[in-house]
Amino acid sequence: MTGPEWAHTRGTKVGQSSRTPPKVAVLLGGPSVEREVSLSSGQACAAALRDEGYDVVEIDAGHDLGARLIDAGPDAVLNCLHGRWGEDGCVQGLLEWMGVPYSHSGVLASALAMDKQRSKDAFVAAGLPVVPSVIAKAADVRMGHVMQPPYVVKPNNEGSSVGVYLVHEAANGPPQLSEDMPQEVMVEAFAPGRELTTTVVGDRALTVTDIVTDGWYDYDAKYKPGGSHHVVPADIPADIFDLCMDYALRAHHALGCRGVSRTDFRWDETKGAAGLILLETNTQPGMTATSLTPEQAAVTGMTFGKLCAWMVEDASCDR
């Protein structure tokens, strides 16, 4: 079955298209719990791409996404969706089937990165340091400690610190998880220390950011103005800085990521290099005004508009 007349040959990059300027569909919103963050990311990227001279259409992704893409006829998709359906391989599979070049990682890497336990398995196989974790039933977690505190409970397949519970060392009782938590959750040993993160663009690690907060780096700290303070480049020892850069690139490759990814760490400075722990890799990092990836790109000389343009020009199928 042939694709629509605007579909590209698989593997073709947008920069090779004959249409000038390229028409870009920015996917945003969607039905996940991270909808609001996605709207902010998508709107910011759409505005930046227009400033860069692209013909942009914004699509709030829903069940009619395929039909809306056919109507729009884009040269490429900039995927600014966050959370389930948008960054877990589902939308990527639709775009592959339709033959529409798209940004970020492909089906397999997206699905693997969204599954925190399986991505950890890939990190371990690549020789990267992670903390112990188990998959447990939410009902069992509510009944008693499934791991010696301190530990963290989180959905196995959500991002942006949505639904994350920190159980302190002195906690007498188990966490009372909300009823909207999935039936199975990840329970992970708490990694103390400083919050560090590194973005990879293509095959290049950009820099390291030290994320300073007054407490737990939760959803509000990530996305609300003033919720956290970013020190970039991070003021940390050179060997730890270099390890973050190395680990982020290795994690990117271990999952098979493409385009842009961001890897988060915890560093216990009392333990030196042995205290650096890889937490997770995000295949579609936030692109809001307070987001880490645009900030890191700016430090390396890449404006927000140029970063968005790079992602569009990098778009392809068979990712």
From Swiss-Prot:
User: Which InterPro entries does UniProt cross-reference here?
Assistant: ATP-grasp (IPR011761), ATP_grasp_subdomain_1 (IPR013815), D-Ala_lig_Van_CS (IPR000291), D_ala_D_ala (IPR005905), Dala_Dala_lig_C (IPR011095), Dala_Dala_lig_N (IPR011127), PreATP-grasp_dom_sf (IPR016185)
Q: Where is this region: Disordered?
A: 1-23
Disulfide pairs?
Answer: none
Kindly give the SUPFAM superfamilies that the UniProt entry links to this protein: Glutathione synthetase ATP-binding domain-like (SSF56059), PreATP-grasp domain (SSF52440)
Question: What's the record's note on cofactor binding?
Answer: Binds 2 magnesium or manganese ions per subunit.
Q: What class of enzyme is it?
A: ligase
Question: What GO cellular-component annotations does this UniProt entry give?
Answer: cytoplasm
What positions does the entry give for ATP binding? 147-197
Q: Which residues are in the ATP-grasp domain?
A: 120-313
Q: One Pfam family from the UniProt entry?
A: Dala_Dala_lig_N
The UniProt record gives the binding positions of Mg(2+) 1 as 264, 280
- Tell me which EC number(s) this protein carries: 6.3.2.4
Query: Which cofactor names does the annotation list?
Result: Mg(2+); Mn(2+)
**Pathway where this protein functions:** Cell wall biogenesis; peptidoglycan biosynthesis
Q: Which UniProt keywords apply?
A: ATP-binding, Cell shape, Cell wall biogenesis/degradation, Cytoplasm, Ligase, Magnesium, Manganese, Metal-binding, Nucleotide-binding, Peptidoglycan synthesis
Can you supply a Gene Ontology BP term from the record? Answer: cell wall organization
Catalytic activity, as annotated: 2 D-alanine + ATP = D-alanyl-D-alanine + ADP + phosphate + H(+)
Q: Which residues bind Mg(2+) 2?
A: 280, 282
Where does the UniProt annotation locate this protein?
A: Cytoplasm
One GO MF term on file is:
metal ion binding
Describe the function of this protein: Cell wall formation.
- Family of this protein: Belongs to the D-alanine--D-alanine ligase family.
Recorded hits in PANTHER family, A to Z, give: D-ALANINE--D-ALANINE LIGASE (PTHR23132), D-ALANINE--D-ALANINE LIGASE B (PTHR23132:SF23)
Q: What is this protein called?
A: D-alanine--D-alanine ligase
* Provenance organism: Roseobacter denitrificans (strain ATCC 33942 / OCh 114)
What gene makes this protein? ddl
